């Protein structure tokens, strides 16, 4: 089956003035994903979003960092056009599974979340500027198997990284810096996530075979 091109959206605002040749900050070597036209996004399709931390900043999984990240996620879990349903916090990136009405709402919602995170993390780190300076990467999930695979990847991502580093990860290990606790149970009001509204995230993914290819 032909692979779908992932959705890649811009976090940064365009700034003042119109489009000008050579205007704006030059692209740094090794910076994030290239800018692509936004494909259509239907509200029934959840999205797996990855946000990469600026190089040189402390780990997001630190004892001081994670509570700040969790607080920002909770504050933005149902604001600015997105609903945060699942997440995992890694040392230098975030994985999110969100619902949004359309591509515009997704872009505005993730941009707002990035601003919220930057404000709080800069205060903690004593730094300035964008904390997630690159365009975020987003993959639209259109089938039960895609959603199941994405959820497994997100909530087990830390175990995946540990295994790549040679550590033995016991089966069933749950990452406490993720939404794994609410994978099959409704989140409480104190959680940094909200209950899913889309059929794919509520019920559809449960009907897919484990490790099924989309």
Give each language-model segment a name.
Residues 1-47, 51-91, 99-214:
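Short Pro-Cys-Gly-centered "Cys-loop" motif that presents a nucleophilic cysteine in a tight turn
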């Amino acid at each position: 089956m032909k692979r779908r091109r992932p959705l890649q959206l811009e976090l940064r605002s365009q700034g003042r003035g119109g489009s000008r040749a050579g205007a704006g900050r030059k692209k740094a070597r090794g910076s994030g994903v290239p800018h692509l036209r936004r494909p259509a996004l239907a509200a029934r399709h959840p999205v797996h979003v990855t946000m990469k931390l600026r190089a040189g900043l402390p780990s997001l999984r630190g004892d001081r960092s994670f509570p700040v990240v969790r607080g920002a996620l909770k504050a933005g879990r149902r604001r600015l056009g997105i609903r945060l349903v699942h997440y995992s916090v890694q040392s230098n990136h975030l994985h999110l599974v969100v619902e949004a009405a359309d591509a515009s709402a997704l872009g505005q919602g993730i941009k707002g979340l990035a601003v919220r995170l930057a404000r709080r993390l800069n205060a903690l780190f004593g730094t300035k500027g964008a904390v997630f300076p690159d365009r975020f990467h987003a993959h639209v999930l259109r089938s039960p198997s895609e959603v199941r695979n994405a959820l497994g990847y997100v909530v087990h991502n830390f175990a995946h990284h540990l295994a790549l580093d040679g550590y033995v990860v016991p089966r069933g290990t749950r990452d406490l810096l993720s939404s794994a606790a609410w994978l099959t149970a409704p989140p409480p009001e104190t959680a940094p996530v909200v209950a899913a509204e889309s059929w794919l995230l509520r019920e559809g993914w449960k009907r897919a075979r484990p490790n099924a290819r989309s």
